[in-house]
């Protein structure tokens, strides 16, 4: 696969079309192309079979929805390099294996199944929980902008990854946004403070490096937000005016794939902004080993 394109999964649903909009903007910011894909397990068995010309055939319908999505992306970001492809596999397998590696995969939160959250449960959630590259889930929610400056939120958990911090910093720089590092803990404020210090220090260094390469005067700020209490409540509140929330998935010995945890799961289901899930390892300890 080409690695110079943002990838967006398309199924023709309103949610996936919102994902196309978001992905087109993201590709434009990054100076990348946009690859629009649709997964169809039937295509695996029908490759090489001549199209019968039936305008109602699945193959024709897939071509139509990809064309419509590509046209939408072109109208949103004229001149963006676009490619379309039908992946001959069931969706989860296609998106996890066929697209590896990818700089970024964008998905809608709700597909054609008709039940709220069905696609998120059956495809988006499984892909986000197992992917080794960043996955952004875009919800059908109107984005509220009540802050004077743009905001990217980095949600800290007990196993926060350096990769998630790096991705959040990158997004803040691309969007000319401040980075809000948010952490809530049920108990143990000392450990929570230590984690916050580690992440903020790392993010500040990354932002300083990025700022040295910027040609304009904007400089992103790192804002700390921590509180004792239920993490879900605090994070959902902070997500209201955010352009993006970034969460980290971690590997748990004895389990296959990555672990999202209940808080990250809740963010994917309910956060009123796009949510990026970034795989990675915890920050190294002083000895250089993963904590």
Where are the model-predicted features located?
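Conserved N-terminal glycine/acidic-rich loop preference
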Residues: 17, 34-36, 59-66, 102-108
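A short acidic, glycine-rich active-site loop
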Residues: 54-64, 196-202
């Amino acid at each position: 696969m080409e690695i110079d394109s943002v990838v967006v999964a398309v199924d023709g649903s309103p949610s996936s079309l919102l994902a196309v909009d978001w992905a087109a903007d993201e590709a434009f910011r990054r100076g990348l192309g946009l690859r629009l894909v649709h997964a169809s397990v039937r295509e695996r068995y029908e490759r090489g079979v001549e199209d019968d010309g039936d305008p109602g055939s699945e193959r024709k319908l897939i071509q139509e929805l990809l064309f419509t999505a590509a046209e939408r992306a072109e109208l949103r970001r004229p001149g963006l390099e676009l490619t379309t492809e039908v992946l001959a596999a069931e969706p989860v397998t296609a998106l996890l294996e066929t697209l590896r590696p990818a700089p970024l995969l964008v998905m809608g939160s709700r597909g054609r199944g008709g039940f709220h959250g069905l696609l998120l449960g059956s495809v988006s959630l499984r892909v986000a929980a197992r992917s080794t590259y960043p996955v952004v889930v875009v919800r059908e929610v109107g984005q509220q902008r009540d802050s004077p400056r743009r905001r990217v939120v980095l949600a800290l958990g007990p196993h926060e990854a350096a990769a998630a911090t790096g991705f959040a910093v990158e997004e803040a720089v691309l969007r000319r946004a401040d980075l809000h590092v948010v952490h809530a803990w049920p108990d143990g404020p000392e450990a929570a403070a230590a984690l916050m210090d580690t992440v903020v220090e790392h993010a500040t260094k990354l932002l300083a490096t990025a700022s040295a390469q910027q040609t304009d005067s904007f400089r992103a700020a790192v804002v700390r937000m921590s509180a004792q209490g239920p993490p879900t409540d605090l994070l959902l509140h902070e997500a209201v005016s955010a352009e993006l929330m970034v969460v980290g998935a971690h590997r748990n010995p004895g389990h296959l794939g990555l672990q999202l945890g209940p808080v990250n799961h809740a963010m994917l289901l309910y956060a009123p902004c796009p949510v990026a899930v970034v795989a990675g390892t915890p920050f190294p300890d002083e000895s250089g080993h993963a904590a």
